[in-house]
UniProtKB/Swiss-Prot annotation:
Keywords: Acyltransferase, Cytoplasm, Transferase
Protein family according to the UniProt entry: Belongs to the phosphate acetyltransferase and butyryltransferase family.
Gene Ontology CC entries for this record: cytoplasm
Catalysed reaction, written as an equation: acetyl-CoA + phosphate = acetyl phosphate + CoA
Protein function: In addition to acetyl-CoA (100%), the enzyme accepts propionyl-CoA (60%) and butyryl-CoA (30%).
Gene Ontology terms, MF aspect: phosphate acetyltransferase activity
Keyword Signal in annotation: no
InterPro entries referenced in this protein's UniProt entry, alphabetically: P_Ac_Bu_trans (IPR012147), Phos_Acetyltrans/Butyryltrans (IPR050500), PTA_PTB (IPR002505)
Name under which the protein is recorded: Phosphate acetyltransferase
Amino acid sequence: MFLEKLVEMARGKGKKLAVAAANDDHVIEAVYRAWRERVCEPVLFGPEEEITRIIEELVPEWKNPQIIDCPPEEAGRLAVEAVSKGECDFLMKGKIKTGDLMKIYLDERYGLRTGKTMAMVSVMEIPDFPRPLIISDPGMLISPTLEQKVDMIEHCVRVANVMGLETPKVAVVGAIEVVNPKMPITMEAAILSKMNQRGQIKGCIVDGPFALDNVVSEEAAKKKGIQSPVAGKADILILPDIEAANILYKALVFLAKAKSASTILGGKVPVVLTSRADSEETKFYSIALSAVFA
């Protein structure tokens, strides 16, 4: 339901998507669906013969897709170049290593840096849970610093605003809900909360530290006597590092059967940077989310 709203927001805007190394089955399926549902206009970079073969095998009804024929090793550079020149509006990773694509994206020659931290934001639609959860960062920053977490919160708030949340509630999550000097994450959480109170982080309500149960269950928060507007009502979860965030993301997807959409924000254009294990549906929703910000 929530993710379909993103699809509706992206539909019909004609945003051009540069797909770097599009010679991948799941990528082609997701991009075709995005084209069919008018979420974007794909431009496929990579070996034309292989891309055409995949299209003919999987989606033969897709006639005359725009393909820029090039060797796989050139696809990333040419796709980023197209985005840099304004020929395309946003970027998607295909059959290319994440590190290789982001190294090209961050090359100063292409002018796509903004000075902000680039981070992954994921929207999770969980069965029987009353609202979407926005989490960061399950796939980009290995061990984000305090300063980087400020930018992560800003990116998440932008996504929440697009989804209709005017003042989202942000929980900085760790293992416990009290400050413990032996656990630096809890001290960072308290600092972020105070920065929000002093107006250094705007447009949201930030509180922490919290354990996960305290921010998704009002009952759990009440049992522990936690009084906070965020307790049990969080819209955004800021996780301590990529390991915690990635484990939560995959637990929600594979165990709780959540649907998801992810995008990389912080550069001049968003990047669709999904995992090979992600489903065609996840890739499709990620294209839609990124198109909204393109």
